[in-house]
């Protein structure tokens, strides 16, 4: 028998067993409905305690102290284990045991015996402590709140199918503590970032999710249709241009935490729908942003994890202190010490397209015919340097032709006052001094339109209203976007973005 045939046989047997268990549970529910006025789904039980709170408040008390207290609680949750008279009940804050002595079991009779793993119950009783020191509720009252018709995957050796974890996240969260913890961390990260920004006098705002003209980033948009207006609209790829309109309007510090949508491929680092925190501050430049980012990330790590140092794969990442800063040009030379062409490269050579194409091909970059010198430089960097940036690093010196919204450098107008922030070998943030020269922005938008006509699907559209906003005057401003999903990946030592997005995009099942 081949492995494939054997696996298919095992799967068929598991499916048959599961179907049998489902049928048995449905029969139990039918019996419950006959004897329950709520049709088997009562909604009058009220809990007054959480397992986690009880552990904190009473976990250190002795068995004798708890007996003297006779503290009665009402708990509710999902049955995760049933061992004779003991039940393990799980809810959002943790787990606690419930104990049904023989007298209680006699009273409950079939009601207790018919209980299955996965059922949701309510229990009332006094808190006690076992000989091993574990808290438990001495069951005096018990009520089945929801009958689980499907068995949990422990019956079938756990939820080991990675794709099924994402498709049935609800099951993953029930049985996988690591998954639950990752999303608790995510929630804390969001709260910590929000609180930090508010403490720095930033105002939280909401900008449109559907745009008439997509903008703010180089990406392919999702297209939809507004029936009432009979016009195409685009799910936003970035909120940038709307946020800068607010700065023009007089809100000097704004931020938004929300979703962006990009009609691109799936990978361990990319999901078409993802979360960004984007912010803008007037009378600041990109160097101020780097300082603020150092403070923000060290603060978030300390608040969420209790430390600025954490493991990531085989490395230990340090969020505290001052982060490395180097230009893209410097990084390419630094991480390619044995590449003669790169070591001989000068900043002036970057504008020699033939030379840049030659170098790009030598490091296995598949060159597109419409790429500019700046795009070639970025691709060489991405291929040879980016994966090596494990510790927090700001990469500066981005060419203007790949930075259509960034202010040109006063020292060399070929470059811009822009950085991207890397950690764990991936980009996590992008920031720059904003281009507030309306005429320069107009010219760059037109160059983007030409690039799109030449085959660059990710080039930006021309946004006339944004030019009008700039003509009213945008103060000197700096802005930045931080990828929440990738940041959470780092803080949870996770290597695929699907593990930190509750419901990631999935291909249809066959």
From Swiss-Prot:
GO molecular function: ATP binding; lysine-tRNA ligase activity; magnesium ion binding; tRNA binding
Record-listed Mg(2+) 2 binding positions: 427
Disulphide bond pairs: none
Keyword Zinc-finger part of the UniProt annotation: no
Subunit annotation: Homodimer.
Enzyme Commission code(s) on record: 6.1.1.6
Cofactor info, note text: Binds 3 Mg(2+) ions per subunit.
Gene3D superfamilies: Bira Bifunctional Protein, Domain 2, Nucleic acid-binding proteins
Protein known as: Lysine--tRNA ligase
Signal sequence bounds: none
Principal subcellular localisation of the protein: cytoplasm
Gene Ontology cellular component terms for the protein in this record: cytosol
GO biological process: lysyl-tRNA aminoacylation
Gene that this sequence comes from: lysS
Domain of life of the native organism: Bacteria
Organism per entry: Vibrio vulnificus (strain YJ016)
One Pfam entry name: tRNA-synt_2
Keyword line: Aminoacyl-tRNA synthetase, ATP-binding, Cytoplasm, Ligase, Magnesium, Metal-binding, Nucleotide-binding, Protein biosynthesis
Catalytic activity: tRNA(Lys) + L-lysine + ATP = L-lysyl-tRNA(Lys) + AMP + diphosphate
């Amino acid at each position: 028998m081949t492995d494939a045939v054997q696996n298919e046989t095992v799967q068929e047997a598991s499916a048959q067993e599961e179907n049998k268990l489902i049928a048995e549970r449905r029969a139990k529910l039918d019996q419950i409905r006959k004897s329950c006025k709520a049709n088997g789904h009562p909604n009058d039980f009220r809990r007054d305690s959480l397992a986690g709170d009880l552990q904190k408040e009473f976990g250190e008390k002795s068995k004798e102290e708890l007996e003297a207290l006779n503290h009665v609680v009402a708990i509710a949750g999902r049955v995760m284990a049933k061992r004779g008279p003991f039940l393990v009940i799980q809810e959002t804050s943790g787990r606690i045991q419930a104990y049904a002595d023989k007298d209680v079991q006699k009273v409950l009779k079939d009601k207790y015996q018919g209980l299955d793993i996965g059922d949701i119950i309510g229990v009332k009783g006094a808190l006690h402590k076992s000989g091993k020191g574990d808290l438990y509720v001495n069951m005096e009252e018990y009520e089945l709140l929801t009958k689980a018709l499907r068995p949990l995957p422990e019956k079938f050796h756990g939820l080991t199918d990675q794709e099924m974890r994402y498709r049935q996240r609800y099951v993953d969260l029930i049985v996988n503590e690591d998954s639950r913890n990752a999303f608790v961390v995510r929630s804390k990260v969001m709260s910590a970032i929000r609180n930090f920004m508010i403490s720095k006098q930033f105002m939280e705002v909401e900008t449109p999710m559907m745009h008439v003209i997509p903008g703010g980033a180089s990406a392919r948009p999702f297209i939809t249709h507004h029936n009432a207006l009979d016009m195409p609209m685009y799910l936003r790829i970035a909120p940038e241009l709307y946020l800068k309109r607010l700065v023009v309007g007089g809100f000097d510090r704004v931020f938004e935490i929300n979703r962006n949508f990009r009609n691109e491929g799936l990978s361990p680092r990319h999901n078409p729908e993802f979360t960004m925190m984007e912010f803008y501050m007037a009378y600041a430049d990109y160097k101020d942003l780097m300082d603020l980012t150092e403070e923000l990330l060290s603060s978030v790590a300390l608040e969420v994890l209790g430390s600025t140092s954490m493991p990531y794969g085989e490395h230990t990442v340090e969020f505290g202190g001052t982060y490395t800063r180097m230009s893209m040009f410097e990084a390419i030379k630094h991480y390619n010490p044995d590449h003669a062409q790169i070591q001989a490269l000068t900043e002036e050579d970057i504008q020699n397209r033939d030379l840049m194409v030659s170098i790009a091909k030598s490091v296995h970059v598949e060159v597109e015919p419409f790429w500019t010198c700046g795009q070639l430089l970025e691709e060489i960097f991405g291929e040879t340097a980016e994966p090596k940036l494990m510790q927090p690093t700001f990469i500066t010196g981005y060419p203007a032709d790949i930075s259509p919204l960034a202010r040109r450098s006063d020292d060399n107008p070929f470059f811009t006052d822009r950085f991207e922030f890397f950690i764990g070998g991936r980009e996590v943030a992008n920031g720059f001094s904003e281009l507030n020269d309306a005429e320069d922005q107009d010219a760059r938008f037109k160059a983007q339109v030409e690039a799109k006509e030449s085959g660059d699907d990710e080039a930006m559209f021309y946004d006339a209203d944004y030019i009008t906003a700039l003509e009213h005057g945008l103060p000197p401003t700096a802005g930045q976007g931080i990828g929440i999903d990738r940041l959470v990946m780092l803080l949870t030592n996770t290597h695929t973005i699907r593990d930190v997005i509750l419901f990631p995009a999935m291909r249809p099942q066959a």
